[in-house]
Amino acid sequence: MERKDFETWLDNISVTFLSLTDLQKNETLDHLISLSGAVQLRHLSNNLETLLKRDFLKLLPLELSFYLLKWLDPQTLLTCCLVSKQWNKVISACTEVWQTACKNLGWQIDDSVQDSLHWKKVYLKAILRMKQLEDHEAFETSSLIGHSARVYALYYKDGLLCTGSDDLSAKLWDVSTGQCVYGIQTHTCAAVKFDEQKLVTGSFDNTVACWEWSSGARTQHFRGHTGAVFSVDYSDELDILVSGSADFAVKVWALSAGTCLNTLTGHTEWVTKVVLQKCKVKSLLHSPGDYILLSADKYEIKIWPIGREINCKCLKTLSVSEDRSICLQPRLHFDGKYIVCSSALGLYQWDFASYDILRVIKTPEVANLALLGFGDVFALLFDNHYLYIMDLRTESLISRWPLPEYRKSKRGSSFLAGERPG
């Protein structure tokens, strides 16, 4: 049949076909299929999938596709990436879904970074690390060798680790290389904290000292405690140093002058931790940006005003038992929003805005875990034998790692958690 005659015939057939009922159309198609050969059936098979299974992700505007993708969980999105190159391209380009996925894993999101592939890679890296945690393959160990006596004090900041020892020295290490950056002669160190220029040490000789890294010289000596100084913190902005001691006292010092500004009393046990931190929420007694002074002993956490008033009164005392039947572990976490401390019953988390207990996370599998670090998604805990990682969303222990042999300190100074930006 000539092409022109065929087109005329096809037009007539089409008009007639459109006039049929659905049942008649179906019978017509069945009859045509029965008359078709292999070439026609293959053609039908190839085109039916396109006609019946529309690729909505390909056909929809990109904005609508992104809106639909936001309803899927990350694991489903990764599966969808395997459907086709087009699906992988669209899904990988949706910045918001990958940022949200990273945020749900506890990642700090920089909204200025809008590279979708960057956030997808971050998520995949985090998932791999989660798998490594579950398989106990996420840790590496290294040793820093240099002290000749017990190491009693640790502090980590920006990839640098400071160690204070009974050998009357403090050393600053580059964690990534294992190299000692500075080594200076000090007194016995029970607590250390440092920045680029200086080192502050609390000592078993009942004093606090400030040292210059570059020269090793002692630039300030703070005398006044009658017991070992177990914890120190300072603020250059306020020009204030605070210290907690075995004499049950917290002292506030002028950092540059070395003079004692105030002595805060009220503790009836060793003060094992002091924290000087900016408030990030509006509380009953503070506003965002205000500096907060916290101190902790075996049973209580106290919140103090930062001032020079004599006989200064504690603003608030937090505890987990009124009869002192439950002890607090010596470590304390405060990020400006929440106070977290461990006890024999589990982790206690207080809301700093109201001072109410938000939750108690119990660890029935392992008792008496000490707190090492507390984040948005994970917490680091340890006992005499293992380091544990807890998923705070499920309140379950997801991994553990054997610790080297050590003598547990009543001050909780045996271990610390490092921090990485982002």
UniProtKB/Swiss-Prot annotation:
Expression by tissue: Widely expressed during embryogenesis and in adult tissues.
Domain F-box as annotated: residue spans: 54-101
Keyword Repeat set for record: yes
Location of N6-acetyllysine modifications: K298
UniProt subunit comment: Directly interacts with SKP1 and CUL1.
Function of the molecule: Substrate-recognition component of the SCF (SKP1-CUL1-F-box protein)-type E3 ubiquitin ligase complex.
Transmembrane stretches, start-end: none
Top-rank taxon, per record: Eukaryota
Protein name (Swiss-Prot/TrEMBL): F-box/WD repeat-containing protein 2
Keywords: Acetylation, Repeat, Ubl conjugation pathway, WD repeat
WD repeat start and end residues: 146-183, 185-221, 224-265, 276-314
PROSITE patterns in UniProt: FBOX, WD_REPEATS_1, WD_REPEATS_2, WD_REPEATS_REGION
GO CC annotation: cytoplasm
